Amino acid sequence: MEKRRVVITGLGTVNPLGNNTADSWAAARAGKCGIGPITQFDASEFKCKLAGEVKGFDPETVVDKKEARKMARFTLLALGAAAEAIQDSGIDCEAEAENIGVIVSSGIGGLPTIEEQHSRGEEKGMEKVSPYFVPMAIANMAAAQIAIRFGLKGMCTCPVTACAGGTNAVGDAFHRIRDGYEPIMVCGGAESCISPLGIGGFTSMKALSTSTDPDAASLPFDARRGGFVMGEGSGVLVLEELEHAKARGAHIYAEVVGYGANCDAYHFTAPAPGGAGAIGCMKLTLKDGGIAPEQIDHINAHGTGTHMNDSCETAAIHAVFGDHARDIAVVSTKSMTGHLLGGAGGIEAVFTALALRDQFAPPTIHYEQPDPECDLDYVPNVGREMKMEYALSNSLGFGGHNACLAFKKWEG
């Protein structure tokens, strides 16, 4: 089967840096911090008091008030991002309905909805929970509601692979088009679990930063790092077969050229020693795209700000790229957004495509104290104009799920 070329024709995002792509990318370029005190519940008695919250998003710009009440927040954020991406792409959803698929990930789904309805059940009896509880809470509903809202009748799925899910979604969509199944895919990830149980659970694992200073909380690759900061939001892309995009005169941001996915098969939360799984995943991606290691100029790293992730990912980059590793601009945009879990791969794919378009690497902010175990070029604190042809985006999830995408600058 002849492999078809795949390009990005639409971008959309709602995240702690902004409620659309233009505002979010401007903030990322400028090194703005989207992290602040938790406002979605009273966190005064919690060790963790900071998160990357979406601010000022109005779901009624996407669905009416009655319908919004039937959806969890992660679904509404996904609909906001998808609406922007679809409008940006200029695709005719009605005319192309049978040709457009949806793959959108969520790692946890409607956790706040589960908490709210459990409290209601405890108070009034479990048979008095909302009849919309189950369809609000299940993780596939972001993908399903996007398909319903826009009438998209191609394949519709939801990878639930923790923090790798958004990247799996984009990668699976890429292969779906490349291998001839659909010409257009709407793909990405969404998450919103800034709630007592979500924050409490990750704090109990000692995964979250307990800093009370927004400028000293999300510290990827810095020696002071002590855990990630929870973020929320969604990033959605429209991928399209190249000739289909050209035929309708679509604007093209970048080309998707490679995808790899594998499993550590080591531990349910800790990465494999030396980043073994990440090494294999990046190698699979380069092989899939026919890319030589020395061709990679930029990596949007998983870069969570936990001690083990950042040192293992750095070791993996050294192992894959050898001496060239020090010439790569390795960035963690989680320093600005926090960690969007299943939504991370979506927004980071958006940022990587824009980095290639603008020939600009956004910074890793809050970087002050180098760690001998993290010794790459992390573009500290100030973004950088630079020539780049190929870029990777890494996502490494609980369960040992690893996913990586390769993008190429569009020369058209």
Question: Can you say where each PLM-predicted feature lies in the sequence?
Answer:
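Short glycine/threonine-rich loop-to-helix capping motif typified by GTGT followed
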Residues: 266-275, 304-321, 326, 340-347
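Glycine-/small-residue-rich "gating" segment that lines the acyl/pantetheine channel
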Residues: 123-130, 171, 175, 191-247, ...
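Condensing-enzyme catalytic core mediating Claisen C-C bond formation in acyl metabolism
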Residues: 5-9, 32-36, 213-289, 297-298, ...
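Active-site-proximal alpha-helical scaffold in enzymes
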Residues: 78-91, 139-143, 147-191, 229-250, ...
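Conserved beta-ketoacyl condensing-enzyme motif
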Residues: 8, 24, 29-161, 190-199, ...
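Phosphate/pyrophosphate-binding loops at sites that engage ATP/ADP/AMP, CoA/4′-phosphopantetheine
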Residues: 85-96, 245-249, 282-298, 320-324
